[in-house]
């Protein structure tokens, strides 16, 4: 049996591993992937149940703001964003959500 998984997309955060640990401490497997993951690469991952867009202070690279691919929004995965104001997610947080907020997200997607 394969594990359910939350994908964390790195959009310039320094706290990706903190979020991954928080999710794992809640009993759910997570993986960190780069912001420019393609639709095909994401769909090739097993048992993805939700996505966290994790922005941060390192969002600008070579004068360009790091963006998530717009096509990812149309895939039907539940998504939340952390410190990524451009997102089109159901829930947006300015800072790392507490365990209660993260549990609410996980229960929303039935994990």
Model regions and ranges:
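N-terminal beta1-alpha1 cap of cysteine-dependent amidohydrolase-like domains
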Residues: 1-108
């Amino acid at each position: 049996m394969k594990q359910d998984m939350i994908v964390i997309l790195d959009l310039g955060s320094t706290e990706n591993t903190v979020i991954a640990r928080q999710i794992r401490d809640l009993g759910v497997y997570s993986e960190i992937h780069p912001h420019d993951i393609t639709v095909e690469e994401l769909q090739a991952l097993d048992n993805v149940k939700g996505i966290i867009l994790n922005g941060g202070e390192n969002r600008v690279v070579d004068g360009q703001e790091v963006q998530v691919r717009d096509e990812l929004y149309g895939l039907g995965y539940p998504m939340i964003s952390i410190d990524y104001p451009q997102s089109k997610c159901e829930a947006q947080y300015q800072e790392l959500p507490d365990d209660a907020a993260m549990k609410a997200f996980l229960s929303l997607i039935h994990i």
